[in-house]
């Protein structure tokens, strides 16, 4: 079926849960995309921290095509070689001793919360069901995970919500300690809030949560869906802090654009899960696993991870230079190649407008709420692409400073 597609078709045919850009990308290479009209964009959005190696990376294409020529899917009644290799790679690279594969970050977090409840019920009784999460967090869109995420705008239309979930202020250990007690089964936290404003945790905060969980026999869950797989300059952000969780969720960059998620667990935690307690049709399929295995092989090297840290310094240096010219941002923060620019009060609420102006100038950026412009470029983005993209971003900032959009 040959059909001429326009952006207007989205508004005609798709459920209106997104408001996509007015252009349609049709081709990508590295950190560059081209739309239907042939206009080039430097991609600093990265599919929302997904495209770890940019677009159409040759090694990932080769891994996908090689597996696609063999077989695609069997279901969870059978295992496959790519998923077992990937599991061993993750175990060797992290604290984990067991892995559960799924299709997304939301599914990984759903599995983590279910495991935590079962662990507590089996070991301590059904009274131990409380989950402590944090305001402005984001853990996914299932009913359980959207309830754990501390953003009522995403959950208020779906009441009644799952009970026994309470929220503390992020980076406020005293507030968390008032909620964590012997009825708590788990604490779920992002080492750096992504959707909540690109806000890194303090080391003292995460260390304190670890101590509180140990004291009250609660599991500590790190949601590393956005921060994982090299994004911060370590394979996983927990490695920056020297704080090891009981469970860790990962997705987004793990497949480099091919859908895959995973829950990493210690043997002690994983042992409560038995045949039939949880599952997924597509999780750990050979296509996704082959791509993720190749991506992990490329990313988990000193050269790549050190390169992310170096790129961070160059990126932030250029952003600071832009801010010296236009004064739009009160703070530039983040780790590695997850960077947020917080708007000055004068420009409050204009993050979306800035992202739209950036696209007009030929660079794709993200927002993290109404007041933070977010960057999540490919981990292998070149110096030339950074320079070109931020020159274009500077044009957008100049237009905003001048008082509007063009």
UniProtKB/Swiss-Prot annotation:
Enzyme Commission number, as recorded: 2.6.1.81
Catalysed reactions, as listed in the record: N(2)-succinyl-L-ornithine + 2-oxoglutarate = N-succinyl-L-glutamate 5-semialdehyde + L-glutamate
GO molecular function, one term: succinylornithine transaminase activity
CDD domains cross-referenced by the UniProt entry: OAT_like
Pathway: Amino-acid degradation; L-arginine degradation via AST pathway; L-glutamate and succinate from L-arginine: step 3/5
UniProt gene name: astC
Keyword Lipid metabolism: no
Required cofactor(s): pyridoxal 5'-phosphate
Biological process according to GO: alpha-amino acid biosynthetic process; arginine catabolic process to glutamate; arginine catabolic process to succinate; ornithine catabolic process
HAMAP family cross-referenced by the UniProt entry: ArgD_aminotrans_3, AstC_aminotrans_3
Sequence positions bearing N6-(pyridoxal phosphate)lysine: 252
Protein name: Succinylornithine transaminase
Pfam families recorded: Aminotran_3
Family: Belongs to the class-III pyridoxal-phosphate-dependent aminotransferase family. AstC subfamily.
Statement: the UniProt record of this protein carries the keyword Transferase: yes
Known function: Catalyzes the transamination of N(2)-succinylornithine and alpha-ketoglutarate into N(2)-succinylglutamate semialdehyde and glutamate. Can also act as an acetylornithine aminotransferase.
Keywords in alphabetical order: Aminotransferase, Arginine metabolism, Pyridoxal phosphate, Transferase
Species this chain originates from: Citrobacter koseri (strain ATCC BAA-895 / CDC 4225-83 / SGSC4696)
């Amino acid at each position: 079926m040959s059909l001429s597609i326009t952006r207007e078709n989205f508004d005609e045919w798709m459920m209106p849960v997104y408001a996509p850009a007015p252009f349609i990308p049709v081709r990508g290479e590295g950190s560059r995309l081209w739309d239907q009209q042939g206009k080039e964009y430097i991609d600093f959005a990265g599919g929302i921290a997904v495209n770890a190696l940019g677009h159409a990376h040759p090694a990932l294409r080769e891994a996908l095509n090689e597996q696609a020529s063999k077989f695609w899917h069997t279901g969870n009644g059978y295992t496959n070689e790519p998923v077992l290799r990937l599991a061993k790679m993750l175990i060797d690279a992290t604290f984990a001793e067991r892995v559960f594969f799924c299709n997304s970050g939301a599914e990984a977090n759903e599995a983590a919360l279910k495991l935590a409840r079962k662990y507590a019920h089996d070991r301590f009784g059904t009274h131990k069901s409380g989950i402590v999460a944090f305001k402005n967090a984001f853990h996914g869109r299932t009913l359980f995970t959207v309830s754990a995420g501390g953003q009522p705008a995403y959950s208020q239309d779906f009441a009644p919500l799952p009970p026994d979930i309470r929220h503390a202020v992020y980076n406020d250990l005293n507030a968390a300690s008032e909620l964590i007690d012997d009825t708590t089964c788990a604490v779920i936290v992002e080492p750096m809030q992504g959707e909540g404003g690109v806000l890194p945790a303090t080391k003292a905060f995460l260390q304190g949560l670890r101590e509180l969980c140990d004291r009250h026999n609660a599991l500590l869950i790190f949601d590393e869906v956005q921060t994982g797989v090299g994004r911060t300059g370590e394979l996983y952000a927990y490695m920056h802090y020297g704080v090891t969780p009981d469970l860790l969720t990962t997705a987004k960059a793990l497949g480099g654009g091919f859908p895959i998620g995973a829950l990493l667990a210690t043997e002690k935690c994983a042992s409560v899960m038995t045949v039939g307690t949880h599952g997924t049709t597509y999780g750990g399929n050979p296509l996704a696993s082959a791509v993720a295995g190749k991506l992990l092989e490329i990313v988990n090297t000193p050269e790549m991870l050190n390169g992310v840290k170096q790129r961070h310094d160059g990126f932030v240096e250029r952003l600071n230079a832009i801010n010296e010219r236009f004064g739009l941002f009160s703070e530039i923060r983040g780790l590695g190649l997850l960077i947020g620019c917080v708007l000055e009060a004068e420009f409050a609420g204009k993050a979306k407008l800035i992202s739209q102006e950036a696209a007009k100038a030929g660079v794709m950026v993200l927002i993290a709420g109404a007041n933070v412009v977010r960057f999540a470029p490919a981990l292998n983005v070149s110096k030339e692409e950074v320079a070109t993209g931020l020159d274009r971003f500077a044009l957008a900032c100049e237009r905003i400073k001048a008082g509007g959009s063009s």
